[in-house]
Amino acid sequence: MRVVALCILAHASALGRKKTNGPSVKVSATLAVDKKVVGKADALFKKRTAASCDAAAKIYEDELKRTGYADADLLLKAADAVNTAMRIRTNSNTITIDGTVETPANKAVWKKDGQRAYDLAAKGLKALDKKVDARALGIRFDAFMFSCSHKSLVKQALTGTGTAYKRMGEELQAKHPRHDGDVGSAVLACFYHVAPWPVGSPKKAIQNARKAVQRGGATLRNLYYVAVISYGQKDYATAAEFFKRAIKASPGSPSEADFADFMKSEAKRGLAKAQEMLYKLDLRNDEIASNSSGQALWAMPG
């Protein structure tokens, strides 16, 4: 793990005012969308590999160019395909017991395609007008997150970008608590976990992580986030419990499945580390108890 923290002040206008590059949205398409062409792209997208999503995105974008960038569903499909390719390649910029996966290689992916995905998503929401649903908001959120990630979301947590990121997460959480396993609560948990003081909050991080489990279900991602955040807060017993549960859990949505193998692998590593820390704590407690007992014996009158 959807960690979620967060480009420059201009990104704060992403909730409707952000300037986008590329062709602007037209009032109506000059040509009807070719359903056969879109169907071919849909079939590629369903394969859920980075390469197939790349191919699907190109077909969607070529069709958008041909028809005038006015079809909301096609715009969102294109954004979703680009998002998915990035999610697969970079493990969704999720959190780990070591922090994040903001590596140079991953940042290069986000720099190349993040803004592209956001432009498509923003146009899609504009074309929808007042018919914005959970899917559209989720696609825009992921695109925004990826568009900022190449500059490190953690470093931008205290900027307008961080504010916009949090507001988008809160909107998903409030309006669509069951969408994608309560992804709104999940991304807020990651935000509060990685953001520096005064925005970061261990209490809010674990509260939102547990809320995602309660409202969105005990999915792989949701359990993994509780485990990682608990580990970061030195609650190794809870971390071990939830890592065990995550290892046995299934992804709750296609987007979770995109980086499920990574979360499973990290959960196994996290479990081993949590158990190691618990063992060390037990040894320390035994040593303290032994020393206390020895001191008590010395203090007894002879």
Annotate each PLM feature:
Residues 22-55, 69-73, 77-130, 134-171, ...:
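Short coil/linker segments at helix-helix boundaries
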Residues 175-177:
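Mid-length scaffold segments of soluble, non-membrane domains
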Residues 236-240:
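Short amphipathic alpha-helical heptad-repeat segments
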